[in-house]
């Protein structure tokens, strides 16, 4: 038992040493921690990713040795409030998401990391939700639209009031890969689930599009949805 505790403590010490190395690197110029225009990934950026991956692997190893998945329990037992395992995992995911906008190979890596986390750890509810939506977004951005749609639609089926899921799909078909028919499907799905979207971008785009092509039937349909949205939106605090 004592040997096991010593091994776990040594892994925690290794994690904190890696975290200190990351903090040291961030004092230098990296794409993520600098301000201004995005840069190409440099050696500092790539080293940060590798350090965070080592940290994640060690956290998972601790979880396996403890035979628990809940990271909050690991935090309370082994980490200080200012540098918890949860915080380091969340920061790693944020970094991958940022770098993925520069290099799609990093987005592919983010898919692997989220799958690794989902298989081995239980994060807080908000981050679990964020990861499920982000995973679908990663698949979409790397060209696997079918997988992305399957994941996000399954998520919406189980959580029909989670606005970020609709927003994610809306962004796909408004900006990433414009498709007016698929955008209409997103709005139809929100209407079907009686979900009030935070923004009116989708409604506005559809009304203007159908008006421009002379499709009176669809223009009236989405104008009605839009008018109802405006009435309901005024009564809700987000």
For every predicted segment, state its role:
Residues 1-6:
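Short, Lys/Arg-enriched N-terminal segments with co-localized hydrophobic residues
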Residues 9-39, 43, 53, 76-101, ...:
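Amphipathic alpha-helical repeat scaffolds of TPR domains
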Residues 44-55, 104-118, 145-155, 179-193, ...:
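Alpha-helical repeat scaffolds
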Residues 59-83:
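Acidic, Ser/Thr- and Gly/Pro-rich intrinsically disordered linkers and low-complexity segments
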Residues 77-85, 123, 157, 194, ...:
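Structural signature of alpha-solenoid helical repeat scaffolds
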Residues 99, 104, 142, 175-177, ...:
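Structural motif corresponding to the intra-repeat A-B loop/turn of tetratricopeptide repeats
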Residues 126, 160, 195-197, 231:
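Short coil turns that delineate tetratricopeptide repeat
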Residues 202-205, 209-238:
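Terminal, low-structured helical/coil segments at or just beyond the last alpha-helical repeat
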């Amino acid at each position: 038992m004592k040997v096991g505790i010593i091994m776990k403590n040594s892994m925690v010490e290794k994690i904190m040493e890696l975290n200190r190395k990351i903090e040291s690197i961030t004092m230098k110029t990296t794409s993520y921690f600098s301000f201004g225009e995005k840069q190409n990934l440099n050696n500092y950026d790539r080293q940060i990713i590798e350090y965070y991956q080592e940290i994640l692997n060690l956290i998972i190893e601790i979880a396996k040795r403890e035979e628990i998945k809940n990271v909050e329990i690991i935090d309370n037992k082994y980490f200080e409030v200012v540098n918890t395992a949860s915080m380091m995992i969340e920061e790693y995911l944020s970094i991958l998401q940022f770098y993925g906008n520069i290099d799609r190979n990093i987005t592919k890596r983010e898919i692997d990391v989220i799958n690794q986390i989902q298989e081995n750890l239980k994060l807080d509810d908000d981050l679990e939700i964020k990861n499920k939506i982000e995973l679908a977004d990663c698949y979409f951005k790397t060209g696997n639209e079918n997988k992305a749609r399957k994941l996000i639609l399954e998520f919406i089926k189980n959580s029909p009031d989670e606005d970020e899921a609709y927003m994610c799909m809306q962004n796909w078909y408004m900006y990433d890969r414009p498709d007016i028919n698929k955008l209409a499907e997103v709005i139809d799905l929100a209407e079907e689930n009686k979900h009030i979207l935070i923004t009116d971008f989708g409604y506005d785009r559809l009304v203007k599009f159908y008006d421009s092509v002379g499709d009176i039937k669809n223009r009236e349909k989405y104008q009605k949805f839009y008018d109802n949205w405006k009435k309901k939106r005024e009564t809700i605090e987000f």
